[in-house]
Amino acid sequence: DNLVWIDHHVCSVQLVEQHLELVSVKGVLDMRYSAAALVYTWFHKGAARIPYWIQLVSDYDTWAKQLVDTDAFNYGMLASDWSVESDLWESLTDDVTMNIVRKGESVLEYIKQRSKSHLKSYGFVTEFAGYKCLAVNSRYESSMIFDSVRNQYPVCVMFEFTGRCWKYSLYT
């Protein structure tokens, strides 16, 4: 009775399908929403709406990307103190959320400009598996480096040498 299982991963849904005795465990399994959204709705039954910041977290975590502010909020949070000890968690009103979005928009603009410069300096057109592609020697952690040229190439390749091995990421 003291256990509440809240999850949004496909493997958990499959586990319940394979072990029907788990159906009786109190909680919610729903792949459409993030665990943050599921936890909020579980503990705030009857709430008129889910706070916007939780909607943004859910949109990002489930890769839905339906909300216009999702990426900006993510990068704004990355540029903030979001540690467990941070006071931020006590003050996430819609106004604070929008301030974080504005901060993230600045971060995204910086990334956009840096990506263009990096592609110009370290990118080159080549062929991969019969496809014309853009390759770039980069340690970037995101496919966003290719955003300015995404529609020009069917395949983009990011690669780097770590000193021990080559790492490759393919984007289509």
Where are these regions (language model features)?
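Active-site acidic/histidine proton-transfer and metal-coordination neighborhood
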Residues: A79-V96
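Oxyanion-binding "anion nests"
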Residues: V96-G130
